[in-house]
Amino acid sequence: MAEKHQDKMTNAMNNSKLYLIQSFGCQMNERDAESLAGMLEDLGYCPTSAQEEADIILLNTCCVRETAESKVFGLLGRLRKLKVAKPDLILGVCGCMSQQEDAAKRIRRSFPFVDLIFGTHNIHELPRMIHQVQENHEAVLEVWATEKGITESIPVKRKDKLKAWVTIMYGCNNFCTYCIVPYVRGRERSRQPEDIIDEIKELVQEGYKEVTLLGQNVNSYGKDFKNNYRFADLLMAIDDITGLERVRFMTSHPRDFDQRLIEVVASAKKVCEHYHLPAQAGSNRVLKMMNRGYTREHYLELIRKIKERVPNASITADLMVGFPGETEEDFQETLDLVKQVRYDSAFTFVYNIRSGTPAAKLEQVSEEVKSERIQRLIELQNLISLENNQREEGRVLEVLVEGETKTNPDLLAGRTRTNKLVVFQGSGHLPGQLVQIRITKGRPNLLEGEVVPNGT
C-alpha cells in the first residue's frame, strides 16, 4: 500500500538557497531528478545552473554504462576545489551508481568531502537527510538494500510545460545477463492505476498535452497485482482522459508485447504510433546468452503484427554490439535484422562490462572489433533513417509545437505522433499547439516542413 510523503520541513530553509541537479542516464533518472527538484523547492531552494552559486549539488547517477560512472568520478574530482572554497556546500551522490554497495564505498573512500550518498529506493527521504547533514555536520550514507514499496505524493518540479514523464512502475524482473538494472532498481512494483490516472488528470489541468508512461518494462505493469488489471487496461483508461492529446510509453520488452496490447494501441485514439522495442541483437545465439527470453523469429513476427494493425507505425530500438562471444556471423544477423525491420531510428551502443552481471565473466570481444562493428551498424541505420524520412516528403503530418529550435530562434520545432522531430518556420504558433505541417525535406535525424494554412 502506497505511503504518503510527509517529510517537508519547509521552514528549515531560506528562500535564497540554490540547488543544482546533474543527471546521467535514462528517462527514469530524468524523472527521478524532477522529484529531487520538487523536494528541494519545497524546502525553499531555487534552481541554478552555476556550480559555484549552488548551496547543494546532487549528482543523479547511472551505472548502465562505464562512461557514465567515469563522468561522475571525474566531476567529483573537479568539485573538490569548490567544496574547499565553500565548506557549507552540501554535495550529494544518488541514483543507480550509488545504489551499488561497492560504488558507494568507493565514493566515500575516494571523495570523503561528499556529504550525502543515497540510492534509488529512498529518494523520498531527501529532506530528512539534508536536515540530518545540516544538524549534525557530518556525512550521511544511507543506501537501502531493498525496496520498501512505492511512495506517492512526492513533490515534482517538471522541466517541460507541455510533455510529462509519468512513472507507472519501478524495478525489473528480467535479469538480462549484461544488465545491472534489476540489482539497483529492485523487483517490479506497479503503481495503483487510480494514482497514475489522478496524476495525469492533474497534468492536463496544468496544461500538459502529452504524457510518456515510464517503466523498465511497461508491458509487465500489473503483474504484481492480485487482479488481472494489466498495461492494456491502463492504456484504455488513460485514453479516456478528457483534454489529453497524446500518450507514449517506454520501454517495452518484445517478449511481453502481446496481441491484446497490439489491439489496444491500434484502437486507442491518443496512443501515439511509435513503439520502442529494444532488440539488442539479431542472433538467436546471442539473444539466448543475453537471457532476453525471445528469438529473432518472435521479434520479427511481433513487428509484422504491429505493422499489420498500425501500418504507419514508427519502430525504434536499442541495439548492442560486441556482447561477449559475438562472432562476425552473429553481427551479420544483427545487420540483417536492421535491414528487415527498417527502424526509424536506433540507439546503438557498444557492450561494456558491468561488474556483478553474468556477462562480465564471459570471454570478451576486443575493443578494436567492437569499434569497427559499431561504425558499420551506425552507417547502415543512418542510411535507413534517411530513406524512411525521405518517404515522408510531401505528406502532411500533425505536429505538437514544442518551441524555438536551440540554434535558430526563427525556426520552431515539434514532434509528430510517430516521434519524428520536425523543424519549420511559423513564429505565430505558440508551444502546445497542434499544427499541420507539410514535409519538404527528410534528413537522417529530422524532418523539415512548412505550415499548411488552415490545416488543409
Curated annotation (Swiss-Prot):
Q: Which residues bind [4Fe-4S] cluster 2?
A: 172, 176, 179
Q: Which GO terms describe its molecular function?
A: 4 iron, 4 sulfur cluster binding; metal ion binding; N6-isopentenyladenosine methylthiotransferase activity
Entry-linked Gene3D superfamilies? Methylthiotransferase, N-terminal domain, tm_1862 like domain
Which residues of this UniProt protein bind [4Fe-4S] cluster 1?
26, 62, 96
Q: Which UniProt keywords apply?
A: 4Fe-4S, Cytoplasm, Iron, Iron-sulfur, Metal-binding, S-adenosyl-L-methionine, Transferase, tRNA processing
Tell me the ranges covered by the MTTase N-terminal domain, including all copies: 17-135
Localization: Cytoplasm
Lineage top rank: taxon? Bacteria
| Disulfide bridge positions per record | none
Family to which this protein belongs: Belongs to the methylthiotransferase family. MiaB subfamily.
| Protein name according to UniProt | tRNA-2-methylthio-N(6)-dimethylallyladenosine synthase
Q: Which organism is it from?
A: Desulforamulus reducens (strain ATCC BAA-1160 / DSM 100696 / MI-1)
- Could you tell me the gene encoding this protein? miaB
